[in-house]
Amino acid sequence: MSQHPGADGAAPVFADAVDARRAIRAGRFRGHTSGLVPAHAQGNLMILPRAMAEDFHRFCQQNPKPCPILGVSRPGARALPTLGADLDLATDVPGYRVYEGGELAAQLPDLTGVWREDLVTFVLGCSFSFEAGLIEAGIPLRHVALGRNVAMYRTSIETQPSGPFHGPLVVSMRPMKAADAIKAVQVTARMPAVHGAPIHLGDPGLIGIRDLARPDFGDPVPIEPDELPVFWACGVTPQAVAMAARLPLCITHAPGHMLITDLLNRDLPFL
């Protein structure tokens, strides 16, 4: 079944993860993936030359909250069977970013023209995967309701370095009432494969965020007077780290534009 638009600006509907990936591969969908195929886990991408892969793997092990590994490809491989059938790492994400020397060099709809045989792909857990659990728990998510990407911010919290990889932790933010924030901690603490429990609640200044209305990535999301900002470690962290490290080459997903896998969110607590 192919994609069709949702009502009132809602996310499009796909039959399953394979259907979504095929629509993305064919260029029929290029938007952010929050709320798409909600039963399935989504992943952030970090694609590096083989020479840098070992240091990055160690970086992920030392920083499991922002960089929980769901899968790692063989050098040059565009398939990753552990995460999905009929999955192509070079075409099945709605948007890619290419960084050279720490600077954004290109934004591409696919990587077919730049793929190399020495590239290794890391797929990292994404907070979009726990959003279905939050919604099932009765916790409203404003960015989903508004059809926006989640708001993401650089913080003053430094990651643990490994080789050339170092830099600030990036967080995603969801506004919630206090009672919902408590439930959100309980729900997401059971899902360490997709960032786990929040790293901070409340005053954003305590983690170096000056203005919630001006996210570094994603879209601003309004906060009501009776709500708290709740912050989770975010898989955009590797992009900030790559920029800080001025790596010769790395390729990532565009923020909010994830790889939709065949993994089910309900199975993530057991990975």
UniProtKB/Swiss-Prot annotation:
NCBIfam families assigned: PRK05463.1
Assigned keywords, A-Z: Lyase
UniProt xrefs under PANTHER family: D-GLUTAMATE CYCLASE, MITOCHONDRIAL (PTHR32022:SF10)
InterPro entries in alphabetical order: D-Glu_cyclase (IPR009906), Putative_hydro-lyase (IPR038021), UPF0317 (IPR016938)
First-tier enzyme category under EC: lyase
Source organism (scientific name): Methylobacterium radiotolerans (strain ATCC 27329 / DSM 1819 / JCM 2831 / NBRC 15690 / NCIMB 10815 / 0-1)
EC code(s) of this entry: 4.2.1.-
Family membership: Belongs to the D-glutamate cyclase family.
One MF annotation (Gene Ontology) recorded for this entry: lyase activity
SUPFAM superfamilies for this protein: PSTPO5379-like (SSF160920)
One Pfam family this sequence matches: D-Glu_cyclase
Name of this chain's protein: Putative hydro-lyase Mrad2831_3350
